[in-house]
Design a protein with these regions (language model features):
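N-terminal beta1-alpha1 cap of cysteine-dependent amidohydrolase-like domains
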Residues: 1-202, 207-245, 253-283
Length: 283
């Protein structure tokens, strides 16, 4: 309105530049500013006091909220302060739960409790990276009753290492050399939740992690109801788990938040927000 754009273009000798098409941006602003309803999502993490720690996830919820014409109110909950005695109070009133990425042992028992709460109470659940691994551990402990099931990142002596380093990683002493980084392919199981979310049989997503789903436990987990529905075609590594009998329960080893934009909200966040909205309207 003030004409600053014209002045800038003239100064840069770009006055003949084509006017940008702002229709998509304006549509986003309209839907973001005028939501039809509000939902509450619990973000379970151990760095919640540092708001920028989960900036990409928070931005992804803005994108997905606008796409669903709903305001997403994210409630940050420190996983270190969650236990069996207070979890119902801590997570009361939420319409969905996200367990955030992270490294190290601190706060993981609270994350595992949050997974259990979402699973047992039929709350929409999205586990990202470590959040996917916590879902596997929770299922192994509480459904398969594998006492002490854990990741070798947290307990190298666990009797049931359902999350572990791959064999070829174990001899590498430089930690940076064991990281799985960048874009990796993933084949999706037909008729799974994620197959419907992506509307595709093959995707490519970005990774930043070290430990993996231990395939030695895959048969037990799948027979008990936790399905591996996303597999890397070259390595056979499990990238996605879900519970088909749950309204919406998905854990992904990768980071969908890295690819979400205003113009292209990530379909996983869009679908999760839609599931949380459905939960808010039907419960």
């Amino acid at each position: 309105e003030e004409g600053l754009d014209v002045i800038t273009l003239n100064k840069l000798k770009l006055s003949d530049a084509t006017a940008p098409n702002l229709e998509q941006w304006n549509n986003f602003l309209e839907q973001h500013k005028n939501p039809k309803s509000e939902i509450k999502i619990g973000l379970i993490g151990k760095y919640v006091e540092l708001q920028d720690s989960y900036k990409s996830i928070l931005e992804s919820f803005i994108h997905a909220g606008a796409e669903n014409k709903v305001k997403v109110k994210v409630i940050s909950i420190h996983s270190e302060y969650i236990n069996t005695g207070n979890i119902a109070e801590k997570l009361k009133g939420l319409h969905g739960i996200v367990v955030a990425p992270g490294f190290g042992e601190r706060g993981i028992e609270g994350k595992i409790e949050a997974v259990r709460y979402a699973r047992e109470n039929k709350l929409p659940y999205l586990g990202i990276c470590l959040g996917m691994q916590m879902a596997v551990i929770e299922y192994a402990r509480n459904v398969l009753h594998l006492e002490g099931a854990n990741s070798t990142e947290m307990n190298q002596d666990t009797p049931h290492p359902v999350i572990d380093l791959m064999d070829e990683q174990k001899s590498i002493t430089n930690k940076g050399g064991t990281m799985r980084l960048g874009a990796w392919e993933c084949d999706l199981e037909k008729n799974s939740i994620v197959w419907g979310v992506y509307n595709s049989e093959n995707i490519e997503e970005r990774h930043r992690h070290r430990y993996e789903y231990n395939d030695e436990y895959r048969t037990q987990l799948e027979e008990a109801g936790l399905k591996a529905t996303g597999i890397n075609p070259k390595t056979g590594l499990v990238e996605i788990v879900e519970i088909p009998t749950h309204p919406w329960f998905v854990g992904v080893q990768y980071h969908p938040e890295y690819k979400s934009t205003v113009a292209n909200p990530h379909p996983l966040f869009v679908a999760f927000v839609k599931a949380a909205l459905d939960h808010s309207e039907n419960n």
